[in-house]
């Protein structure tokens, strides 16, 4: 709206403002469209209801309007913004922006109509109270194929993961097109990490984790340890710094803001070893050994928040331990190894507590949504402790190997740097050291 007012007034120095707004609007439009489509999907029982029901027809009309908004925004982005240096083009921008605002008002009105209309999926009959709480029927007894190949859509994590993978691939392609090298191993690591996140949140394990403590712990260990390790080794911030174009003049673009963020006090706090240790490891106790766990499992928003906490806390921890991306205060390698071993010890104690527990974990949730094949809730909690104990060792061993390799390469780089320095100054540092030793020896003889 502000840009439309400036254009109507024919303020000439508005091109840069329009370019900045265009990038922000693109992100907002994408998120709005994806969230709206996902929200509409959950309210339809079958795809054909988008044409056969009043709710579906309203939804379809809103989608078409969003497509129209996207087309208008694309015209402004590709044909108008670059020519905003003249007042005549500013008037064209004002007219198109006014049309865009009109379409947006209609779309908002349709959104209000959708919010006050009853969707087709309003009453779904379930065989038990537990299934009605879940929102889906109990999954069958777990099998390898059911856990790995099963599917239950989680639009938030699926779309977010695909966007993250796409942005990384775009950055990689930009570097390659420019003739710059980027390790293929980092690309593979990032895509594998994204795949693990999608599997944890959209595959069969996501349904089973809501009815079984043991299988929940399997998903927890995977999204907290394996996925962050792979994502961190992808070095997304480093890729972004190399792929993004520097801003012109004194203005800040995405690359400059990212550089500021990586060296800001915010990142300094979130990458502090004490902070990441508390959030990543001790957070286990505050979540699983209190009523908070059962309460979060009983809330859809709470469950999503818990998964986000697992993923983000794991990412921050492994960024400090094995991260390639720059950060304000890198931890020395011996400190990284110590932090990792401390985390392993505290995590092992947590697993022992679960295995020695006399009562099932979160009975206020898992006791209600218990499927027929979970015959012993206490044994199920014991299985969760065994999973936490066993699976924590494999990622930890992998991370220890990575730290060892990084430490060795760091020593090699330091040795090479010293050799180059010696070649430049004739080994002045070593000669000064020998002279100092000779002076000390001469002092000892004279005394």
Give the residues covered by each predicted segment.
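Alpha-helical membrane segments of multi-pass proteins
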Residues: 1-447
């Amino acid at each position: 709206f502000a840009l439309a007012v400036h254009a109507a007034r024919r303020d000439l120095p508005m091109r840069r403002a329009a370019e900045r707004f265009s990038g922000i609007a693109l992100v907002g439009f994408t998120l709005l469209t994806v969230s709206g489509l996902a929200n509409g999907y959950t309210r339809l029982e079958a795809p054909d209801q988008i044409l056969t029901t009043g709710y579906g027809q309203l939804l379809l009309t809103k989608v078409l309007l969003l497509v129209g908004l996207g087309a208008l925004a694309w015209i402004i982005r590709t044909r108008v913004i670059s020519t905003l240096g003249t007042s005549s083009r500013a008037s064209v921008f004002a007219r198109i922006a006014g049309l865009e605002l009109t379409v947006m008002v209609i779309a908002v009105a349709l959104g209000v109509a959708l919010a006050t209309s009853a969707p087709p999926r309003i009453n779904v009959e379930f065989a038990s109270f537990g299934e009605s709480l879940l929102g889906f029927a109990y999954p069958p007894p777990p099998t390898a194929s059911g856990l790995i190949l099963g599917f239950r859509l989680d639009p938030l994590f699926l779309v977010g993961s695909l966007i993250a993978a796409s942005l990384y691939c775009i950055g990689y392609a930009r570097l390659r097109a420019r003739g710059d090298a980027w390790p293929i191993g980092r690309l593979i690591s990032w895509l594998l990490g994204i795949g693990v996140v999608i599997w944890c949140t959209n595959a069969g394990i996501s349904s089973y984790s809501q009815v079984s403590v043991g299988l929940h712990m399997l998903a927890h260990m995977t999204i907290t340890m394996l996925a962050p390790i792979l994502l961190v080794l992808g070095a997304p911030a480093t890729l972004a710094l190399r792929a993004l174009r520097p801003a012109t003049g004194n203005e800040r673009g995405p690359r400059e803001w990212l550089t500021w963020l990586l060296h800001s006090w915010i990142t300094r706090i979130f990458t502090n070893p004490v902070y990441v240790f508390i959030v990543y490891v001790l957070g286990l106790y505050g979540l699983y050994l209190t009523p908070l766990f059962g309460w979060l499992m009983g809330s859809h928003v709470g469950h999503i928040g818990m998964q986000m906490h697992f993923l983000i806390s794991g990412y921050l921890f492994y960024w400090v331990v094995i991260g390639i991306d720059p950060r304000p205060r890198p931890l020395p390698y011996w400190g990284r190894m110590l932090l990792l071993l401390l985390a392993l010890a505290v995590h092992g104690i947590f697993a022992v507590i679960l295995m020695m527990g006399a009562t099932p974990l979160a009975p206020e949730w898992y006791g209600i949504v218990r499927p027929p094949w979970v015959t012993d809730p206490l044994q199920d909690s014991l299985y969760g402790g065994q999973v936490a104990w066993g699976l924590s060792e494999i990622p930890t061993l992998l991370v220890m190997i990575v730290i060892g390799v990084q430490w060795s390469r760091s020593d090699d780089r330091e040795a090479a740097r010293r050799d180059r320095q010696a070649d430049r100054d004739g080994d002045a540092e070593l000669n000064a050291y020998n002279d100092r030793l000779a002076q000390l020896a001469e002092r000892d003889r004279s005394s």
